[in-house]
Regions:
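Membrane-interface transmembrane helices that cradle and orient dolichyl/undecaprenyl
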Residues: 12, 160-161, 200-235, 264-272
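Start-transfer (signal-anchor) and selected internal transmembrane alpha helices
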Residues: 1-56, 287-300, 505-515
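Transmembrane helical bundles and short interhelical boundary loops of multi-pass, membrane-embedded
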Residues: 2-7, 227-235, 268-269, 279-282, ...
Length: 553
């Protein structure tokens, strides 16, 4: 009686590329390109790009010396959080009082009905704590976070592409965009939202490689038909923290959280399929989807609720305001919160009571966003369908009719000078990005290149939901959350144009020429629009040369 030799696990290539080369097995593909290029060079270059971005953002940061656009809400809310632990209503003429140097005695007794979460305002408060309640103080946090976002962009693109050079190009492109520059120089919330979203997506992309590596190490011939179990995924927990902070800045982060959560499941299923697991999509929904939900969504929920700590600690003030102040009931149909008339609880009951009050508060704020702005108008409102084409910028600040001989104006007789801060993206970057996104859709759908899918899903989840709300005043600078993924699409397209081979060839020469020319055009465009992004004095003729379309006025 003979005994058959034990079967050895055999690795079989899954398919062939369009060039006829065999696709490497899962074990080799899981290794990625972690050691492909020198990390010291990568980090040194990224830090250098970040320092350049910081210089551009902190230069004359305190001008204009006034509350610009919605800074009047967020900067003052942040100051109240810092001094009171929650947002209190301000006295009349508070803006003028603050700009005159008086920063105390500004508040009324009752809390204020704020309509955005508090994470971004706490970050603004850190700048005010460090540098004072003045324009530099309430803008410096945005400058720091905007610069850190450039660093994150360098590392994100490098992680996706495996190229240090493309990573640095991605960081520079982000740095040279007008929306990013201006929002990094204002005390608004959107730059913080974009930063945390990019951080969350970066962690999810890192989890993809980490999960495949762990799956490869643990999968063997003796594994069950489900494949190895990988329950602890630290990068997903980090992503959950980042998304929690993003939602704690603005609720719109819920859409990319949902979209990339689905992508996590599909990527996990694809990893299992590459190891021969049958019905991988269905099995992964249970084996990977459930743990990922806890790591990503529930962690985000915990972080989000914790970000309301100041509000929860002063829930009693809000509860009492529903009894005496109509601003807390107008959006909820005039109904008082049930917690307002309940006896004050203690211990765990007090926590529960405060959370219930927070839930009622969220209901009223949601009603405000969903219904009470529908009939409003704003001179700078724009349709989201045209955001990626830079259809309608936002005038943040303007000093018009500066006469010759004043403030350094050297306009010819009969003309004048002006200063302006315009929330407008770099047109060359965004228009080129639209073409790159079309290419990304083709590469994701046709070549099934997951990297292009990150760009497509990122733009879709941060842009398309706004089409549901185009009957209310919304603004082009909300597209700042799309920008990192537009830049990713551009850098991936550049990589395809240049090719992976370093050997000289006509194709590589043409690709480098096209990609390099585009980068130079973006840089030249950045220099050209710099004055209308940074409040620089211009003659009227110089200003007109930069306003390419009537709808930009």
């Amino acid at each position: 009686m003979s005994t058959a030799a034990p079967l050895e696990q055999e690795t079989v290539p899954l398919s062939r590329t369009s060039a006829g080369r065999e696709v490497p097995p899962a074990r080799e593909r899981a290794r990625g390109w972690r050691s492909a290029e020198d990390p010291i060079i990568g980090w040194t270059g990224a830090v250098a790009v970040t320092l350049l971005a910081f210089f551009l953002r902190v230069w004359r940061l305190g001008t204009p010396h006034q509350f610009s656009f919605d800074e009047t809400y967020y900067a003052k809310d942040a100051w109240s959080l810092l001094n009171n632990g929650y947002v209190r209503a301000y006295v009349d003429e508070a803006d003028r009082t603050i700009l005159n140097g008086q920063t105390t005695g500004l508040w009324k007794d009752e809390p204020s009905m704020i309509v955005h979460p508090e994470v971004g305002k706490w970050l603004i408060a850190l700048g005010e704590k460090a540098f004072g309640m003045d324009p530099f103080g309430w803008r410096v946090a945005a400058a720091v976070v905007g610069s850190l976002m450039v660093l994150l962009m360098c590392r994100f693109v490098r992680r996706v592409t495996g190229s240090t050079a493309l990573g640095l190009v991605g960081g520079l492109l982000l740095s040279f965009d007008g929306l990013h520059l201006v929002l990094s120089r204002l005390g608004l919330l959107d730059i913080f939202l974009a930063f945390f979203l990019l951080c969350g997506v970066h962690c999810i992309v890192a989890d993809r490689a980490w999960f495949r590596d762990r799956l490869d190490r643990r999968t063997s011939a003796s594994s069950s038909g489900w494949g190895a179990r990988v329950l602890w995924r630290p990068w997903l927990v980090a992503a959950g923290v980042s998304f929690g902070l993003a939602i704690g800045t603005k609720w719109t982060a819920l859409y990319p959280l949902a979209a990339f959560g689905v992508l996590v499941w599909l990527w996990s299923a694809g990893a299992r399929r590459s190891h021969g697991v049958r019905w991988a999509t269905a099995k992964s929904a249970l084996l990977d989807g459930v743990p990922a939900f806890f790591s990503l969504v529930l962690v985000a929920l915990v972080v989000y609720v914790a970000s309301w700590g100041g509000w929860l600690a002063h829930a009693a003030e809000y509860e009492q305001s529903t009894l005496s102040d109509s601003q807390f009931t107008q959006y909820g149909g005039g109904k008082q919160w049930p917690t307002a008339t309940e006896p004050d609880a203690t211990g765990l009951g007090e926590v529960t009571q405060s959370l219930r009050s927070l839930a009622h508060y969220h209901h009223d704020v949601y009603m405000f966003h969903a219904h009470f702005l529908n009939d409003s108008t704003h001179i700078y409102a724009s349709k989201p369908s045209g955001w990626l084409l830079m259809n309608r910028p936002v005038g943040v600040d303007a000093q018009l009719d500066i006469q010759p001989g004043t403030q350094g104006c050297e306009a010819p007789p009969g003309s004048n000078c002006l200063r302006q801060v315009l929330l407008l993206g770099n047109p060359i970057l965004w228009w080129g990005g639209c073409l790159a996104l079309l290419f990304a859709v083709a590469m994701w759908a046709g070549a099934r290149d997951w990297r292009f899918g990150v760009a497509v899903v990122g733009v879709a989840s941060t842009w398309l939901p706004w089409l549901l709300y185009d009957d209310r005043p919304i603004f082009i600078f909300y597209a700042i959350c799309c920008l990192p993924f537009v830049v990713l699409a551009i850098t991936l397209t550049m990589g395809k144009l240049i090719g992976s081979s370093r050997a000289p060839s006509p194709r590589r020469t043409a690709g480098v020429t096209v990609a390099g020319s585009f980068f130079v055009l973006v840089l030249v465009n950045f220099a050209w629009f710099w004055p209308i992004w940074t409040d620089v004095l211009l003659t009227h003729a110089e200003w007109v040369n930069r306003i390419w379309f009537k709808r930009w006025i």
